[in-house]
Amino acid sequence: MESPSAHAVSLPEDEELQPWGGAGGPGQHPGRPRSTECAHPGVVEKVRPKWDNPLQFLLVCISYAVGLGNVWRFPYLCQMYGGGNFLVPYIIMLIVEGMPLLYLELAVGQRMRQGSIGAWRTISPYLSGVGIASLVVSFLASVYFNVINTWALWYLFHSFQDPLPWSVCPLNSNHTGYDEECEKASSTQYFWYRKTLNISPSIQENGGVQWEPALCLTLAWLMVYLCILRGTESTGKVVYFTTSLPYFVLIIYLVRGLTLHGATNGLAYMFTPKIEQLANPKAWINAATQIFFSLGLGCGGLIAFASYNEPSNDCQKHALIVSVINSTTAIFSSIVTFSIYGFKATFNYENCLNKVILLLTNSFDLEDGFLTVSNLEEVKNYLASTYPNKYSEVFPHIRNCSLESELDTAVQGTGLAFIVYTEAIKNMEVSQLWSVLYFFMLLTLGMGSMVGTGTAILTPLTDSKIISSYLPKEAISGLVCLLNCAIGMVFTMEAGNYWFDLFNDYTATLSLLLIVLVETIAVCYVYGLKRFESDLRAMTGRTLSWYWKVMWAFVSPLLIVGLFIFYLSDYILTGTLQYQAWDATQGHVVTKDYPTYALAVIGLLVASSTMCIPLVALGTFVTRHFKIREQFSAA
């Protein structure tokens, strides 16, 4: 079998990179072909669109990278792995993994000036499958990710009500008390699971498409279409808004959060070091994973963005800026989250104590005001020793109130965004205002990520001469959004949230690790690190430092292999894959096994992208083999 490196494509002579003022002549852009009209009179080559300025490119990368993971996953990881201690593995992984791989993808896109499929096909025809795999992952991710924007829209619309609909439990059908499911859970959980999702007891009970979520999903996809319909022309304008607004809201929330009662409890919990967690391998694995996925590596979006740059753009500087801003935003949002979390935990803790005080006061006919938080434990011990029989009757109803246990409750994802935050917001003054700000921020973060994902899908399609010759850019964008919206209706069914979790957990993890591993190998060992270094020097005038070379050639690939082995073994050792189902009779989630057909869907999700790489390489090899045989036969 022929080595792929033997077929690494060399660009035509008139497309070879030339230093400024070199063979291309003064003003000739490096890497850009000379005027096609001179070579082929009467033929006008399609000019590739460009960003209006470098700031626009920087903002679109930030908007793509800084997403919901910064708001609802990073704080959870800090909570799980020692608060401030988690920053140690996080920053190390940023240096050895995040920055190098981000620079690699931006450099590839800027050098090849094509979307993910064309860029990797240019390096080697055997690598076309890498770009196709990125396209498949981005498509599958966009199918389910826009559902988050659907929920954000739903909550945003309901945020204008007074009182907020999740602040109190509804009455039962007889109007004799509160709804039983809501009483067993909480008003915020009830609104999420029953009013928003109308969730079924299991993934096997799909139910029908619900018109209200379906309408919100359609609106969400219409918004995405308006953002991406004209490519860089429309995307470049949108990012000024989607990048700046979340920071504006986060700053407002920080000021408000720090003034809330109990905020210091949350911040103390976050920054109190737990040194033993540094010895926990899962802390390092999750730090690497968070860096990897929060930057959007392997999805093709970064390559697509960079392909619209001037070849002389300083992509190394932009890679460093985006990496630092992304991580700084994650830390900043954690401070906001933990201040809110401290307020919620303190409120629940004090509410619990007040219920215990009321129970004991009524049960033992104590004088109002006699029992306080400061003397509660002392009085409880006195009552237990003086009235043992009566206290034993009351004891099962006395709740164990603990601020530490409230703070220890780790929640991520939709649970943090739509239950924990809403629990805190409902207890704030002018709660409608804070609710509108919060869900508008979630919507802009989600839209920023969707713009990037949409670009990752559309760029390879619009780069295709076959597709673009039949359909204008607006039609391609519309068809992609329409198809995504139609498939996304699955997530508006009663079992939709279970399918959302399945897609969220299994669509990208192994696939993206494999894609980025092949990318690093392709650049360093197929295209050639020295050749790529020469290209970068010709484009930007920068010499590649030893740091980038060592990271690309050795450290980052080994780290990715380690992550890949960990997740693969974790899936195998876990045995039967499980999911969290809502039990309305108990008012909390329960763990259930995925049915066989759901496991088949998981396998299909993973295989649909990962298998593109070997299958396309095999197909290319077979095609070349038969062409060579035909040439020999003809001779």
Swiss-Prot record:
Keyword flag Transport: yes
Chain spans, region Disordered: 1-38
Keywords of the record: Cell membrane, Glycoprotein, Membrane, Symport, Transmembrane, Transmembrane helix, Transport
Pfam families documented for this protein: SNF
InterPro entries cross-referenced by the UniProt entry: Na/ntran_symport (IPR000175), Neutral_aa_SLC6 (IPR002438), SNS_sf (IPR037272)
Topological domains, Extracellular: 78-85, 149-208, 259-284, 341-432, 496-508, 569-597
Keyword Glycoprotein attached: yes
Residue ranges, Cytoplasmic side: 1-56, 107-127, 230-237, 306-319, 454-474, 530-547, 619-635
Similarity section: Belongs to the sodium:neurotransmitter symporter (SNF) (TC 2.A.22) family. SLC6A20 subfamily.
Protein name, per record: Sodium- and chloride-dependent transporter XTRP3B
Organism: Mus musculus
